[in-house]
Amino acid sequence: MSKEIKFSSDARSAMVRGVDILADTVKVTLGPKGRNVVLEKSFGSPLITNDGVTIAKEIELEDHFENMGAKLVSEVASKTNDIAGDGTTTATVLTQAIVREGIKNVTAGANPIGIRRGIETAVAAAVEALKNNAIPVANKEAIAQVAAVSSRSEKVGEYISEAMEKVGKDGVITIEESRGMETELEVVEGMQFDRGYLSQYMVTDSEKMVADLENPYILITDKKISNIQEILPLLESILQSNRPLLIIADDVDGEALPTLVLNKIRGTFNVVAVKAPGFGDRRKAMLEDIAILTGGTVITEDLGLELKDATIEALGQAARVTVDKDSTVIVEGAGNPEAISNRVAVIKSQIETTTSEFDREKLQERLAKLSGGVAVIKVGAATETELKEMKLRIEDALNATRAAVEEGIVAGGGTALANVIPAVATLELTGDEATGRNIVLRALEEPVRQIAHNAGFEGSIVIDRLKNAELGIGFNAATGEWVNMIDQGIIDPVKVSRSALQNAASVASLILTTEAVVANKPEPVAPAPAMDPSMMGGMM
């Protein structure tokens, strides 16, 4: 395919047009009075949303050069979403502001490399000032505030803070669609995995069809148990202790399963068998997690262990285990707290180093199961369109809350970015680097200007007053009042503001230093073939 190439100002101008088209579409959603954007979907009803990254991903422009500019801004939104989970619209607004001011100076003859150095220095100073202004988020009320601001719903704020209190900041909180119209929170304590009993005759409550084991021993192995003789010595030891047994194995079949069921029905002992969770290497890791949580040992050939030699000391223990036809929940495992902490640290380091989004998700699930449990927020709504929009809002709120717990909070509504302007202004830079600093100074005002504009106020008047206000005092665009933003619960996580600024500066600098753009040349549309004259006989 042949290529089309543009150079210097032509290349940058085309990309800037794309930046402006995407940013102008996204920035109308910023702030408490931001508008919605309707996205056409190939199937089903349109999606109505105010989520910046969702809108950015949907935009495809016909002009290849403009589309590249739009895609670079979309990348800023996606990257900010990946790191902080929120702040995608702020990142888009900042990118547009830096690009717009930067292009003016580059066109006037400034050196883009010098400008880039100035931008990087100014952003580093702004980030440092943001961190210095941070307030730690420690209690349930502060967590609820952050979530309520992001989701624009106090009820959602309560659900998220309650979920984080129950499962911890490392716990898994999933968002699912409810069957009804109400949004509700469901918490599963302990370690849960998606494997149920191998025989319904193992249940202890035939009405609920669940097996409840109090203070059980837990046999953990990656082997298949087909011959009951392999575990007979172990079963005899457990029989003497008069405690129930949970068997987690690759499978239990052959004569072993009916023998266990028969002894359960006769009341000889209480036993439940389930298949091991996961597959392949992930299965081995999950079995090791269960062993550490319960204080047991995985009976595996990798460690040179055989089932027939296993003793009661190799078994794990827990306060309670509940098994239904689809899942198993282990509550209060008897594992060594130090060993569990070490395992958690190992999984955290794996999360940081993995490049696969799927692997990261699975590692976070394992981390949550070791840390204390899983919370599920079931989202309910009257229509499918409302449900999709609400689900996106709750996902943003959850991510923002996690970011707040991690790095603290600052005044929201763009106030925090305006508050760091003095720290950036004091940087002593010269020439084009000073120009880069001034570009960042102007960009830091832009979120406040846009929030005010979306609420029907004059942005320049608001920013002028904000520059002279005390730290933390800001403009509440929802009411039109000047208030202490922290006291009013109008807050942003530091991680969100920091990531938005850093990612915006990074991509904007790349656009400013672009000298040539190569795009695919549009293929000429082939003319429709002429109709065969012999087929026109009946038309005369």
Curated annotation (Swiss-Prot):
PROSITE patterns: CHAPERONINS_CPN60 (PS00296). Keywords: ATP-binding, Chaperone, Cytoplasm, Isomerase, Nucleotide-binding. The keyword Chaperone applies. It is found in: Cytoplasm. One of its GO terms (biological process) is protein refolding. It comes from the Bacteria. Belongs to the chaperonin (HSP60) family. This is Chaperonin GroEL. It comes from Streptococcus pneumoniae (strain Hungary19A-6).
